[in-house]
């Protein structure tokens, strides 16, 4: 079964393709479609609302079954922020924010290499903002969790199901690791010896991540849809 992944985020796409390995499913990215699909505005108040909207809209527009992800970081000390605004959190700064050397390098790469590097530059701005927001707080007040919702829709746009996954941890005091994307260099998941998500192997991350958790909850449904031809 061909399954459209309703996201242009290369990090999420890479993770999903690892997770579906072994299933009779070929994950298709929007970039592989014969015609470009319009952006779907993520204007929901919850991860579930956004994931379901994206799955239904992309499936209907493309005429094929679609899986959508909406996910982000919820920090206890920030009242659950950045939440659904995780990807674009730094865009909400009232003015130019002070940038770290890491952020400066990412901005230079974005200017030279284009959209994919630009996404990395935004990640670095988000991480800078997170560090500033928690400056001075001890570990016991830096609790956080990654949250993800996966939603599946049939080719006619009808929603089949949505499931949630969570990975609990805390926010570190400095970036560590080169893997993953987003807030991974700062997120220290529980039970991993103090390593950040970015210091884990791909297999280790998939075993404990919020997206992996959600996928395991929806895997049997995807297998059934594949048998039915969705």
UniProtKB/Swiss-Prot annotation:
GO terms for biological process: nucleotide metabolic process; purine nucleoside triphosphate catabolic process. InterPro entries: dITP/XTP_pyrophosphatase (IPR020922), ITPase-like_fam (IPR029001), RdgB/HAM1 (IPR002637). Substrate binds at residues 7-12, 71, 181-184, 205, 210-211. Its cofactor is Mg(2+). GO terms for cellular component: cytosol. Its EC number is 3.6.1.66. The active site is at residue 70. The keyword Hydrolase applies. Transmembrane segments: none annotated. Binds 1 Mg(2+) ion per subunit. Keywords: Hydrolase, Magnesium, Metal-binding, Nucleotide metabolism, Nucleotide-binding. Pyrophosphatase that catalyzes the hydrolysis of nucleoside triphosphates to their monophosphate derivatives, with a high preference for the non-canonical purine nucleotides XTP (xanthosine triphosphate), dITP (deoxyinosine triphosphate) and ITP. Seems to function as a house-cleaning enzyme that removes non-canonical purine nucleotides from the nucleotide pool, thus preventing their incorporation into DNA/RNA and avoiding chromosomal lesions. Homodimer. Belongs to the HAM1 NTPase family. This is dITP/XTP pyrophosphatase. It comes from Anaeromyxobacter sp. (strain Fw109-5). The lineage of its organism: Bacteria, Pseudomonadati, Myxococcota, Myxococcia, Myxococcales.
């Amino acid at each position: 079964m061909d399954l459209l992944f309703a996201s242009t985020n290369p990090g999420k796409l890479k993770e999903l393709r690892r997770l579906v390995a072994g299933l009779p499913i070929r994950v298709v990215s929007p970039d592989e479609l014969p015609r470009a699909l319009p952006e779907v505005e993520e204007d929901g108040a919850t991860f579930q609302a956004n994931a379901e909207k994206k799955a239904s809209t992309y499936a209907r527009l493309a005429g094929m079954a679609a899986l959508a992800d909406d996910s982000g970081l919820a920090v206890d000390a920030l009242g659950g922020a950045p939440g659904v605004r995780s990807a674009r959190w730094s865009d909400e700064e009232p003015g130019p924010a002070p940038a770290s050397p890491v952020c400066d390098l990412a901005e230079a790469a974005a200017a030279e290499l284009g959209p994919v590097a630009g996404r990395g530059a935004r990640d670095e701005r988000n991480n800078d903002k997170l560090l500033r927001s928690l400056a001075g707080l001890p570990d016991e007040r830096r609790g956080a969790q990654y949250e993800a919702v996966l939603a599946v829709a049939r080719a006619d746009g009808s929603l089949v199901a949505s499931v949630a996954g969570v990975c609990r941890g805390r926010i570190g005091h400095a970036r560590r690791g080169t893997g993953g994307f987003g807030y991974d260099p700062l997120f220290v998941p529980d039970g991993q010896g103090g390593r950040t998500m970015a210091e884990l192997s791909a297999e280790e991350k998939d075993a404990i991540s919020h997206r992996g958790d959600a996928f395991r909850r929806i895997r049997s449904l995807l297998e059934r849809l594949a048998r039915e031809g969705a």
